[in-house]
């Protein structure tokens, strides 16, 4: 069972950055909306603005992506662990992921 969970965790860690790349870019774009002054955005990851609103929104956007990735990883491992009897057979698992922006 320990090896199964390690393999699942490794697979999740390798696929997560690609899965969440688009929302991060979107959040970076949203961070510049509604701000006044000069705003510079680099690939949706870092936002620098002359107004505090732009900086705060950029930080929230980046933190949200990390938080969702962490929550999904923990939930996935919990579901797999709960359904694994350790006998080496296959088990039906169901994972529902909801992301709110």
UniProtKB/Swiss-Prot annotation:
Q: Which residues lie on this side of the membrane: Cytoplasmic?
A: 22-59
Q: How would you describe this protein's topology in the membrane?
A: Single-pass membrane protein
One Gene Ontology cellular component: plasma membrane
Topological domains (Periplasmic): residue ranges?
Answer: 81-101
Residues annotated as signal peptide: 1-21
Lineage, top-rank taxon, reads: Bacteria
Segments spanning the bilayer are 60-80
Residues forming coiled coils: none
Q: Does the keyword Electron transport apply?
A: no
Region annotation Disordered: where it falls in the sequence:
24-45, 82-101
Q: Where in the cell is it found?
A: Cell inner membrane
Q: What is this protein called?
A: Threonine-rich inner membrane protein GfcA
Source species of the chain:
Escherichia coli (strain K12)
Gene assigned in the entry: gfcA
